[in-house]
Curated annotation (Swiss-Prot):
GO terms for cellular component: cytosol. This is tRNA (guanine-N(1)-)-methyltransferase. Gene3D superfamilies: 3.40.1280.10, tRNA(m1g37)methyltransferase, domain 2. SUPFAM superfamilies: alpha/beta knot. Homodimer. It catalyses: guanosine(37) in tRNA + S-adenosyl-L-methionine = N(1)-methylguanosine(37) in tRNA + S-adenosyl-L-homocysteine + H(+). It comes from Limosilactobacillus fermentum (strain NBRC 3956 / LMG 18251) (Lactobacillus fermentum). PANTHER family: TRNA (GUANINE-N(1)-)-METHYLTRANSFERASE (PTHR46417:SF1). GO terms for biological process: tRNA N1-guanine methylation. Its EC number is 2.1.1.228.
Length: 252
């Protein structure tokens, strides 16, 4: 996979994308990430990338020209090795980024993230993009932090990056539910003991316990996720039992 990032602050990405799983993914050849400072594509001597909006208003807007020229350069560089792929604009008004979105992007061969700054974008920039994405209902100083999060979450699902694909697929949200509690050695730490079922060696009992705890945690912390979760018949029965445990007067 090739990932291009357009940013006015390329140095921000050095500490995050060069470390841990994303860094290893690049070292192992699973992902090629390039960060481009689109200020390099300005045409005026002062290297301006922003200007006041027509019609007046507060703040400054990113100009279309540097972004378009930077995208043209990326297309020329990659046209013989990668398809154009999806272009994701960082925008608070965009689609909420989640695990499903990350898994979706991981299927692509080429992704380009455009990081904004200032008040917003010249609307014509949107002609370049296939997706607009947001981390949530709040505004950041720039799109760099959002792009880092999205790249990290996406790279985890690129085939080969995590040797055991059951690992990312077991993460919270991958199956629509929160992840079950996990423990490691020692089995007894300061009086806090690991549930006996996890040390029993009974794999079926462990599977059932994990399923129940995942549903319980989701019900307690993020009940909204259950509205769209695709539950098996077994999960539905367990969930009904959990609801009765929490509220014995709830309808059966």
């Amino acid at each position: 996979m090739r990932i291009d990032i357009l940013s006015l602050f390329p140095d921000m990405f050095d500490a995050t994308l060069g470390q841990s799983i994303v860094g290893r993914a690049q070292d192992d050849g699973f992902v090629d990430i390039k960060v481009t400072d689109f200020r390099q594509y300005t045409t005026d001597k002062h290297r301006h990338v922003d200007d006041a909006p027509f019609g007046g208003g507060a703040g400054m807007l990113l100009q279309a020209q540097p972004i378009f020229d930077a995208m043209d350069a990326i297309e020329q560089e990659t046209k013989d090795t990668y398809p154009k792929g999806r272009v994701i604009l960082m925008d608070p008004a965009g689609r909420r980024f989640d695990q499903d979105f990350a898994m979706e992007l991981a299927q692509e061969e080429h992704l380009t993230f455009i990081c904004g700054h200032y008040e917003g974008y010249d609307e014509r920039i949107r002609q370049l993009v296939t997706d607009e994405a947001s981390l949530g209902d709040y505004v950041l100083t720039g799109g760099e932090l959002a792009a880092m999060v999205m790249v990290d979450a996406t790279v985890r699902f690129v085939p080969g990056v995590l040797g055991n694909m059951s690992s990312p697929m077991g993460d919270s949200f991958s199956n629509g539910l929160l992840e079950y509690p996990q423990y490691t050695r020692p089995a007894d730490f300061r009086g806090m003991k690991v549930p006996e079922v996890l040390t029993s060696g009974n794999h079926e009992k462990i599977r059932e316990w994990r399923m129940r705890e995942s549903l319980k945690r989701t019900l307690e912390r993020r009940p909204d996720l259950l509205k769209n979760a695709k539950l098996s018949r077994e999960q539905q029965i367990i969930l009904q039992d959990l609801k009765l445990d929490l509220d014995p007067d709830a309808p059966k």
